[in-house]
């Protein structure tokens, strides 16, 4: 009986479950594609900021808007320095001693309870229950970095976002950074929602239908809620309003798409019946000791009439993606590679060389499953790199990322 109770206690803790990156909020795409992609977009600006603070003997103050369970803390402290070598193990830009304060704000008390349970052991981390639009920035010491990741500001009206960014610009010191992530207007996931009348179609009815049901439990009734979807011109209009209100205190550093063809609703086909479960398949690429059918990773892009520029971006990325996957498959099989595309962008050619090197090394390995644990994860990283280097910041990914700097 004691043994049974001991194992039951372990099961209830949730720590006795088989780990997997194939499903859930923290799946492989979230950790190895999305978190790292956001970090790579932010990295050059973050490195400059940290270098300035270090020269002055100062530490970083971070404010996470809509922090949820505190994921932003792990995200920001895990960004790797661009100058680190393969021999190093302490490679984070923000070393433990560089963080003065991480403060998270969220309106959801349940998520804040979870955040406190996770980070309670850290003395320089705290969480506040509040609507971040109502938070008095003037009552606090200025922050150096403001996070609003994973669609946080898609909960805001444009007027609220302009007011928030205006307050941040006025209250912050020179060099402060802001990273925002809206839902992209022209993500392939919601092809049925594409419109040219952006003034009257700012919102989508979003539903979290992609998380698996708990074993043995009836799936809960799903709740739809409004989220702002954002294209490039709309984001630039918001930026211009903030510049006008602040006298130019805010500079746009980067506007970029993320998670093209791997957003969560690719697997549900909730808003586009033509979607393939590409997120599940890319999760499989990153999963150790799991081999993936690469034929299924090929994108079958279905254009929508009337959206020439959007279709051109998606089709170009799909063609390059498919060529990289097909060539990798030919390398693994030792078969003839496909004919070159009419256009072979430099990023594609460079990534093909990378995969040739990876497969060559894997072919000589006699330990472990070289395909599943070396070739496929590297293919996943190369597909991510392909997206990053071909994207145009048009709102064609699941997220549209904006990075701003305060200039005084």
PLM features per residue range, with description:
Residues 262-408:
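C-terminal lobe and adjacent flexible extensions of AdoMet/dcAdoMet transferase-like proteins
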Residues 59-68, 178-207:
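Conserved class I S-adenosyl-L-methionine
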Residues 162-174:
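A short glycine-rich, Lys/Arg-flanked "PGG" loop and its adjoining helix->strand segment in the class I
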Residues 224-246:
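Short alpha-helix
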Residues 70-134:
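Class I SAM-dependent methyltransferase SAM/SAH-binding core
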Residues 138-146:
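A short acidic, Gly/Pro-enriched loop at the edge of an enzyme's catalytic core
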Residues 5-54:
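Class I SAM-dependent methyltransferase Rossmann-like catalytic core
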């Amino acid at each position: 009986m004691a043994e049974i109770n001991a194992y039951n206690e372990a099961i209830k803790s949730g720590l006795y479950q088989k780990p997997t990156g194939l499903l859930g909020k923290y799946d492989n795409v979230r950790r190895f594609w999305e978190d790292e992609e956001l970090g790579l977009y932010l990295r050059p600006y973050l490195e400059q900021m940290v270098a300035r603070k270090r020269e002055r003997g100062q530490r970083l103050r971070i404010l996470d808007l809509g922090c949820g369970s505190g994921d932003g803390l792990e995200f920001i402290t895990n960004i790797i320095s661009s100058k680190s070598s393969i021999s190093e193990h302490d490679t984070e830009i923000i070393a433990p001693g560089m963080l003065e304060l991480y403060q998270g704000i969220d309106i959801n008390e349940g998520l804040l309870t979870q955040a406190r349970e996770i980070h309670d052991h850290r003395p320089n981390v705290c969480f506040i229950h509040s609507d971040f639009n109502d938070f008095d920035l003037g009552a606090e010491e200025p922050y150096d970095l403001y996070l609003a990741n994973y669609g946080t500001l898609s909960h805001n009206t444009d007027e609220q976002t302009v007011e928030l960014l205006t307050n941040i610009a006025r209250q912050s010191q020179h060099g402060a950074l802001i990273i925002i992530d809206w839902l992209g207007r022209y993500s392939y996931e919601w092809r049925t929602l594409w419109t040219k009348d952006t003034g009257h179609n700012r919102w989508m009815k979003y539903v979290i239908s992609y998380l698996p049901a708990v074993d043995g439990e009836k799936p809960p009734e799903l709740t739809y809620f409004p989220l702002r979807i954002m294209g490039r011109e709309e984001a630039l209009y918001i930026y211009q309003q903030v510049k006008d209100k602040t006298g130019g205190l805010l500079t746009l550093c980067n506007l970029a798409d993320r998670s093209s063809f791997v957003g969560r609703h690719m697997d549900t086909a909730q808003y586009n019946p033509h979607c393939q479960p590409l997120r599940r398949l890319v999760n499989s690429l990153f999963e150790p000791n799991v081999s993936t059918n690469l034929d299924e990773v090929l994108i079958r892009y279905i254009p929508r009439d009337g959206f020439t520029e959007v279709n051109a971006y998606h089709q170009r990325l799909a063609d390059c993606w498919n060529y990289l996957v097909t060539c990798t498959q030919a390398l693994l099989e030792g078969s003839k590679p496909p004919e070159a595309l009419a256009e072979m962008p430099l990023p594609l050619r460079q990534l093909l060389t990378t995969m040739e090197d990876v497969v060559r090394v894997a072919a000589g390995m006699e330990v472990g499953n070289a395909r599943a644990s070396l070739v496929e994860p590297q293919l996943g990283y190369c597909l991510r790199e392909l997206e990053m280097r071909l994207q145009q910041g048009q709102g064609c990914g699941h997220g549209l990322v904006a990075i701003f700097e305060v200039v005084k």
